[in-house]
Amino acid sequence: MKNKSRQFLKNNWPYMLASFFIPFLIMAIIYLSIGIYPRSSRSVLASDAFSQFSNFHASFNNVLHGKQSLFYTWNASLGLNYLSLISYYLGGLFTPLVFFFNNQNMPDALYFLTLLKIGSAGLSFWFLAKQTFKIPKWSHVTLSVSYALMSFIVAHSELIMWLDAFIYLPLVILGIHRLMDQRKPTLLFVSYFLLFITNYYFGFMIGLFSFLYYFARTFTDWQRYKSRIVA
């Protein structure tokens, strides 16, 4: 297994790095063109990101440094269940990286988290593209960059907790393929688990999409899959 993984990385590392860093750098250049960069006077905080998300990430930073309870906080109205806040806003795998920022620099933290998530979306789609499309290897990278910089992601980039869903969506689709074609459920299970832990809001929508995608794929190749459904 280790040798297989090493061989995979040896053969594909340039494409994997490109799928991550090209959208990462393109988005960073776009931000730079409008005056957004680390420690700049402008930031990625807009709309709810300014009034809510930066404060939520700062409070999570307090949790990580032992200054606040993980289970309940009094820093919102009359208090609230902090775990419910995490389940929608702060459940992403990259969120703990705010530990390395001061609360005063939280706009910079969200700037880097946004770029990391966009780059990760590109890398995630590369895995799907490689397994799905029989096209030249650099075309997989082109598709990955296009996916990571789609208009929805760019337009809603200030809604940072939504970006995680686009990291897991390609893995969910790839997991459906593996379940249908190889009867291997592990990738789909892990992808769903991380998706719903990260953001149940998009998890619900991607769950519905998965249901429809499964049937669409089944009926477009009925002769191949009908025996498995009956079985």
Spans of features found by a protein language model:
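Start-transfer (signal-anchor) and selected internal transmembrane alpha helices
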Residues: M1-I36, V230
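Membrane-interfacial loop-to-helix junctions in multi-pass inner-membrane proteins
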Residues: K10, F133-W138, R224-A231
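Membrane-interface starts of transmembrane alpha-helices
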Residues: Y15, N102-A109, L113, I135-L143, ...
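Hydrophobic alpha-helical membrane-interfacial segments at the cytosolic entry of transmembrane helices
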Residues: L17-F24, V190-S191, Y214, R224-A231
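Membrane-embedded helix bundles of polyisoprenyl
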Residues: P23, G119-Q131, K137-F219
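Membrane-interface coil-to-helix junctions
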Residues: F24-F125, V145-F166, M205
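Transmembrane helix-loop junctions in multipass membrane proteins, especially transporters and channels
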Residues: G35-S40, N103, Q182, T218-K226
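Transmembrane catalytic cores of multi-pass membrane glycosyltransferases
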Residues: Q52, S59, G203-F204, F215, ...
